[in-house]
């Protein structure tokens, strides 16, 4: 006699915790690269974010009278915290990451019912709210430390995060102002503010763009690319979303270069600046808020690439990945509705 059980009859070994853990492992090279170029502040932000995220998950479990392991062991809150911590400036005030984690987990995740119920990517909801509400703190990126006359020590990093100044009394913006030829701290910020004055060639010759790999930003994006390819190889994420996102952006950016030369950064510089690779492989591929159908994934990724192009080239925000992901999240129910695979034996 065979015991009759309901489907599913086969089970995937990709449990939620395993999925989250692999994503975090794939982020470690980029995290290390970011810390190498921007200093100890990266680790301080990550520590605060992870500590608060675990505390919130435990508190929510107790409020809902669930087992603590039910909320903590799936690592979803930890991954959200890590993504947000990497996204914000390393020397942003501590209360920035505190507000961000509270918004991400309480407002954008648990207010919808918890893991699997949220409509929008929690980390990007928090990032977008922080960017709109605290633009000065959220644009306080230091240049790579090899461009600074006196890179912050570990003590300076702690002081900057918790008091806003180094032990010598310098703020982040004062440290940034000590580097000649840099208007803003990231390549995209610098290009956005300096393009009309200096032109493309002048921008590319500035300190933040000089050198083979643009002083750290290329290496960070290459590390995210390598981690993303690992996730595709391990079948943790699908290739359609990052391929469609990067392909759409590269296509539109390339056409702009052909039709309007010398008006924007070239395609390669755009692809390897800001959060492009991070967004393509680690943010847009969130299994809860992304499209679930094969064709839908391509459309979803293409939409993100389109939105990033429009905002970067014609909007006020130089990076645009967070806003683009959130805009595409809105379209997911419609995309999934019209891209459902046809059942065998049924009409179109």
Swiss-Prot record:
It is a multi-pass membrane protein. Its cofactor is FMN. It comes from the Bacteria. One of its GO terms (biological process) is electron transport chain. Disulfide bonds: none annotated. It is found in: Cell inner membrane. Coiled coil: none annotated. The keyword Cell wall biogenesis/degradation does not apply. GO terms for cellular component: plasma membrane. The chain crosses the membrane at residues 15-35, 36-56, 67-87, 88-108, 125-145, 212-232, 241-261, 265-285, 298-318, 320-340. Pfam families: NQR2_RnfD_RnfE. Its main location: membrane. InterPro entries: NqrB/RnfD, RnfD_bac. Keywords: Cell inner membrane, Cell membrane, Electron transport, Flavoprotein, FMN, Membrane, Phosphoprotein, Translocase, Transmembrane, Transmembrane helix, Transport. Its EC number is 7.-.-.-. The modification FMN phosphoryl threonine is found at residue 186. The complex is composed of six subunits: RnfA, RnfB, RnfC, RnfD, RnfE and RnfG. Belongs to the NqrB/RnfD family. Part of a membrane-bound complex that couples electron transfer with translocation of ions across the membrane. This is Ion-translocating oxidoreductase complex subunit D. It comes from Actinobacillus pleuropneumoniae serotype 3 (strain JL03). The lineage of its organism: Bacteria, Pseudomonadati, Pseudomonadota, Gammaproteobacteria, Pasteurellales. The gene is rnfD.
């Amino acid at each position: 006699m065979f015991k009759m059980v309901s489907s599913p009859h086969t089970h995937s070994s990709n449990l939620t915790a395993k999925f989250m853990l692999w994503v975090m492992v794939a982020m470690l090279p980029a995290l290390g690269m970011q810390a190498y170029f921007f200093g100890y502040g990266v680790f301080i932000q990550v520590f605060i974010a992870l500590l608060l995220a675990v505390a919130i998950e435990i508190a929510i479990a107790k409020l809902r009278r669930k087992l603590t392991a039910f909320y903590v062991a799936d690592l979803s809150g930890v991954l959200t915290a890590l993504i947000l911590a990497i996204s914000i400036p390393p020397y942003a005030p501590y209360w920035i990451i505190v507000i961000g984690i509270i918004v991400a987990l309480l407002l954008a995740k648990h207010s919808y019912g918890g893991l699997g119920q949220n409509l929008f990517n929690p980390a990007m909801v928090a990032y977008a709210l922080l960017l709109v509400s605290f633009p000065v703190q959220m644009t306080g990126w230091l240049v790579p430390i090899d461009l600074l006359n006196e890179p912050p020590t570990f003590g300076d990093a702690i002081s900057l995060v918790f008091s806003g100044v180094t032990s010598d009394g310098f703020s982040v913006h004062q440290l940034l102002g000590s580097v000649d030829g840099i208007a803003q701290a990231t390549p995209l910020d610098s290009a956005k503010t300096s393009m009309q004055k200096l032109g493309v060639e002048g921008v590319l010759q500035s300190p933040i763009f000089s050198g083979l790999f643009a002083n750290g930003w290329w290496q960070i994006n290459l590390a995210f690319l390598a981690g993303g390819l690992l996730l595709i190889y391990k079948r943790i994420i699908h290739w359609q979303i990052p391929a469609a996102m990067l392909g759409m952006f590269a296509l539109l950016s390339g056409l702009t270069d052909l039709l309007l030369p010398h008006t924007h950064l070239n395609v390669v510089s755009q692809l390897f600046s800001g959060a492009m690779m991070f967004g393509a492989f680690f943010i847009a591929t969130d299994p809860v808020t992304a499209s679930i159908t094969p064709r839908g994934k391509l459309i979803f990724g293409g939409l993100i690439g389109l939105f990033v192009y429009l905002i970067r080239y014609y909007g006020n925000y130089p990076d645009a990945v967070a806003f683009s992901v959130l805009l595409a999240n809105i379209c997911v129910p419609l995309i999934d509705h019209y891209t459902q695979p046809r059942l065998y034996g049924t009409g179109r």
